[in-house]
Amino acid sequence: MISVNEMGSNVIEEMLDWSEDLKTEVLKLNNGATVIDCGVKAEGGYEAGMYLARLCLADLADLKYTTFDLNGLKWPAIQVATDNPVIACMASQYAGWRISVGNYFGMGSGPARALGLKPKELYEEIGYEDDFEAAVLVMESDKLPDEKVVEFIAKHCSVDPENVMIAVAPTASIAGSVQISARVVETGIHKFESVGFDINCIKSGYGVAPIAPVVGKDVQCMGSTNDCVIYCGETNYTVRFDGELAELEEFVKKVPSTTSQDFGKPFYQTFKEANFDFFKVDAGMFAPARLTVNDLNSTKTISSGGLYPEILLQSFGIRNV
């Protein structure tokens, strides 16, 4: 079985070799852990963001930069293709580990989750568990982790602190924007799972999403980065569905972000109206705007949802001069 942490370790080695070109900074903590700053104090950029996305996906996807037509604007976007969608997206990429140690907080994603089984129910559902001597984690945070944070991660992953490797970028950074847009395929799979679909029948995934500019601090950027997927993210999935075609059609109808009661305005506005309480925001919003599913059993193809570039332009706050 594929070891997502072994795959991630190889990407980390590349990042260490190319840190100057990536405009990242490498820190060695007192307990031997490795921290790669991709945008907290370091400048980072598109290439650092690409490496972050590769790390999140355990290098189990083909990633490329492309352009997206945003009502006539040629906008930077990222394209994701994977033939290991469940392991790449759910066993690794999904941001399923909220890490809070003292005054430090970050959202953890990437391979290390498969060692700590974060969350355990998901790994039981997909039948995956990793076993590797090193833990590779991507942290979305505006602070760099210290030794206490590393010790917390090491304990949960059953590895030595010196074998913990963390790449960090805040939401309000180009690298952070890139790795969030690269979640376009994952958000669709997660939404499928949340509506009761057997995600293990998903055999491949493809998606494209625009990359948000830095529009403010982390909380504002959390809005614009999510909007890239919610309003202009487009995905394609290949599945082997054992049920009736009508049943598959019902599942596909439920997945796009358009089904959410909060759909229709920039996410930051929705979040602000909810007093910045995630639990008051409809979780169904976190999904691609449009998806297409090709079922290999019925050889039928189904599509649902639509793209809404005008809302994304509003979210970005672009001014023509």
Curated annotation (Swiss-Prot):
GO cellular component, one term: cytoplasm
Keyword Hydrolase found: yes
One annotated GO biological process: methanogenesis, from carbon dioxide
Main location (coarse class): cytoplasm
Pathway: One-carbon metabolism; methanogenesis from CO(2); 5,10-methenyl-5,6,7,8-tetrahydromethanopterin from CO(2): step 3/3
Known EC number: 3.5.4.27
Catalytic activity, as annotated: 5,10-methenyl-5,6,7,8-tetrahydromethanopterin + H2O = N(5)-formyl-5,6,7,8-tetrahydromethanopterin + H(+)
One term of GO molecular function: methenyltetrahydromethanopterin cyclohydrolase activity
Class of enzymatic activity (EC top level): hydrolase
Keywords assigned: Cytoplasm, Hydrolase, Methanogenesis, One-carbon metabolism
Any coiled-coil regions, as ranges: none
Pfam families: MCH
InterPro entries linked to this entry: METHMP_CycHdrlase (IPR003209)
Record's subcellular location: Cytoplasm
NCBIfam families: one_C_mch
Function field: Catalyzes the reversible interconversion of 5-formyl-H(4)MPT to methenyl-H(4)MPT(+).
Similarity comment: family membership: Belongs to the MCH family.
Name recorded for this polypeptide: Methenyltetrahydromethanopterin cyclohydrolase
UniProt organism field: Methanosarcina barkeri (strain Fusaro / DSM 804)
